[in-house]
Amino acid sequence: EIHERLVGSEMCIRDRFATPLFEFSGACSGCGETPYVKLISQLFGDREMVANATGCSSIYSGSVPSTPYTMNEKGHGPAWANSLFEDFCEFGLGMELANEKMRARLVKVMNEAIASDCCPAEYKEVFAEWINNMLDAEKTKELAEKIIPMVEAAKDKCNHCKQIADLQQYLVKRSQWIIGGDGASYDIGYGGLDHVIASGKDVNILVLDTEVYSNTGGQSSKATPVGAIAKFAAAGKRVRKKDLGLMATTYGYVYVAQIAMGADQAQTLKAIREAEAYPGPSLIIAYAPCINHGLKAGMGKSQEEEEKAVKCGYWHLWRYNPALEEEGKNPFQLDSKEPNWEDFQGFLKGEVRYASVMKQYPAEAEELFKAAEENAKWRYNSYKRLARENWGADTAE
């Protein structure tokens, strides 16, 4: 058995070895969403807090009487709760604020213990070390293993130790995740999402982008691209997709990434790790093929569909890391290679949501597909311009 600390190191690809703490979900076969949720549980599951929007992800994550979330051998696992469709981000922010408040109480009690005469010197050293490293997840895990037996042994004699023992669940730095689909994130819950990232708090938002309201039957959302047939866009959507990620970068202090696991597993893993490590709000937009897309190859090929989407330019991979700007580097990193644009139309025709336009509205299909390709090229060229900007020169001035 591989030791979890070894697996967690950068020398290993942890997602290949760590035990998933999200398993056997009731999602559709080939669902493009669940691999991302599973990966996050492998990386941070033993200290993960999840605020889940209502939608597909809440159904397969919490259908009574079962849940795919589980625990490791120590009894640690994700803490999951579901909120309404429109306020999932605020719900997650509330979790984070409550956690901050309780940890601030821990700091207060530990400082009082350090200043008192009731605690031995070795206790005070460990308390001081925890205060100095309270935002370091791995260090707090290590220190929690020392602190818990110490305070449990002394709690009957020392009131400070008793208070710390009562708050021991807050010793390890938690990883706060907010999970929802594109309907919740781009549309109904967008105001809340914007409010939460503007707060500057250390939360991680995962948008499972299926480009439709999946759970309610495939209605059009602001994430639905030009030309796709969906409910409320029966003749093919006529306006371009909202660029939620690029909008979030305008704050300048939000970590943002667009990922597609089937296209680039390394980039997906790197983006998720960077987002969680970033000491502020992060937004990850993950491309997720859905049964509503009508993949002609079948949902068993959903990972391959993600790869095709990136290669033809339908979906783009990039990361925006504000920490790089502090080093005088360009925070925007374009991870997609130059697309094979000649494959773009073929990709559209491989999904029923686009192919249906050709059957039902042949006169308009060519125009819509051309517009979809032009929009994709326009967006990719915009990303290329952002990636080329000379941040070193700006910093030197």
Give the ranges of each region predicted by the language model.
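Conserved thiamine diphosphate
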Residues: R14-T19, E23-G26, S83-L97, M102-S116, ...
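Iron-sulfur-cluster electron-transfer modules
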Residues: S9-C161
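Flexible, low-complexity linker and terminal segments
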Residues: E73-N132, A288-E397
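Beta-sheet entry/capping signal
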Residues: P20, D46-A51, C56-I59, S175-W177, ...
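Single conserved hydrophobic/aromatic residue that forms the stacking wall/gate
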Residues: E1-G8
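Glycine-rich ThDP/TPP pyrophosphate-binding loop and its adjacent helix/strand module
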Residues: D156-C158, V172-I178, D187-N204, L208-E338
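Short alpha-helical segments and helix-capping/turn motifs at coil-helix boundaries
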Residues: H3, G32-L43, K162-Q163, D187-L193, ...
